[in-house]
Amino acid sequence: MLSASEGEQTVRLARNTIESFLKDGEQSDSIDLPEVFGELRGVFVTLTKNGNLRGCIGHPYADSVLESAIVDSAISAATRDPRFPMVDISEMSDIIVEVTVLTQPELVDVLPDKLPEVIEIGRHGLIAKMGMYQGLLLPQVAPENDFDAIDLLNHTCLKAGLPQDAWLTGAQMYWFEGQIFKEVEPRGDIEENKFNSCCK
């Protein structure tokens, strides 16, 4: 688990990276960060503006060190999310930055009809995989949208471009947990959002 101070630094790194890139087209200079930023971690950066999603991209798997994963995800969330136009620097005073540091996804090894019984809302995020299709929902999505376990399974499959009941018909479901750090207001204090117990 990251400490509160380390979590705060994840969000500041994400914001500083975005603002530097939008101003100059360059990444901000590397700064001295705690040891955990050199560990392999999955991470997502989420941007919201006036309560609405403005960008969300990340690394589901621990394929990069945390610092690099945050930098890449932050720039991508602001400039490469295909659902939204590129963020303009003038918007950053209205955007809340959130960073979710992930545990390594693991296959949920139960019979499909038992999946709703083992998934814990607020604790588990999900990845649905079938063939070339893959989709992910972060742990905070379910409590933020009042989903139960079946809703979460259905929406994860839809995110993957699959039928919503694909979790019953052959899709592999992976779960993971996330430690969530978020600005209370744009450029404001940073708090850890705890929907449930986390993490391994």
UniProtKB/Swiss-Prot annotation:
Alphabetical list of Pfam families matching this protein: AMMECR1
Domain AMMECR1: start-end pairs: 5-192
Database matches in InterPro entries: AMMECR1 (IPR023473), AMMECR1_dom_sf (IPR036071), AMMECR1_domain (IPR002733), AMMECR1_N (IPR027485), AmmeMemoSam_A (IPR027623), Uncharacterised_MJ0810 (IPR023472)
Coiled-coil blocks: none
HAMAP family the UniProt entry points to: AMMECR1
PANTHER family assigned to the protein according to its UniProt record, in alphabetical order: AMME SYNDROME CANDIDATE GENE 1 PROTEIN, AMMECR1 HOMOLOG
Annotated protein name in UniProt: Protein Mbur_1344
